Amino acid sequence: MSGLLRFAKKMRAWGHVPRDLGRIVRSYRQRTKDGSVCYHNWYPCNDYEDEWFHRFIVRNVGTDHRYHFFSVFGSRIALAMPVQNKVFVSGENVHIPNASAEIYQDYALDKVNLSLGYDDIQDERYIRFPYWLLYMFEPVIDRKMIRERIDEINRAENTRKFDCALIASHDQWNMRSPMYEALKDHLDISCAGKWKHNTDDLWTIYNNDKYRYLSEFKFNICAENFDTPLYVTEKLFDAFRCGTIPLYAGAGNQPELEIVNQDAVLLWKKEQSDHSAFIQEVLRLARDEAYYDKFVRQVRLLPYTEEFVYEKFTLLKERLMKMARA
């Protein structure tokens, strides 16, 4: 703890407010019981043991060393802590102007041993590691398990009980409103989140089980919060795993080209002024069962997905073990 005390004195010399110091000291308590992972500026979490990265380390790396995982939910001052084995992770879009995560658009590469994010950056300290990997795959380096998961997603079917689902807390950057307005008079859109909320079924009937809920719908409006190339979150993959057709906007109209079958997604191209072709395609799918069958049974994840996931997991293991040996 002496290193932390020296760091605290340095912070006071810099004139930083006590709140920053308190946050950093408290972050030392945000660690797993085995001591292998300590979280700083991290996502809200009820169980640090069950966090994906901790489970990855337990299963693939071992718990002999402590790793410090940092994210975007706090001051960059935390990155200056005198600790070893620093890993920065961003599942957020760091390129939204004036958003809080923008201060991390460099992925803290000069402050950590390893950084993970959505962007394609050529740096030995960086791995492109999109956050949807954590939602779709267990933290196990096993080709068979990865292949089985891909097959499961490709075979997923929805019940077609309802028209269209939309689950969102906001639309601050106007990514969802245009699509919603264009379709609301043609489809019954169930808005189960805070934004445009018109149903409590997600909670009262499905006990907040988002996947069981989405699997009841023909379509899912799953636009990103902001349109940035390469930024594809779990939203698109949630639609796939639930067997529903994603009505997607984001990623510069090119969501994970090596992974996602673009023909299995209906893309709302926000830069276009005329969306009549998109609307007509949705309506045909909604009304023509045979046409819907043909569309929804397409392969969603391309063959390269297995290699992509396996390579990312293997590389993460290698980098974590290498930094611990340094």
Regions found by a protein language model. Give the residues of each.
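Acidic, polar ligand-binding/catalytic clefts
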Residues: 93
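Pol beta-like nucleotidyltransferase catalytic core
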Residues: 3-90, 98-326
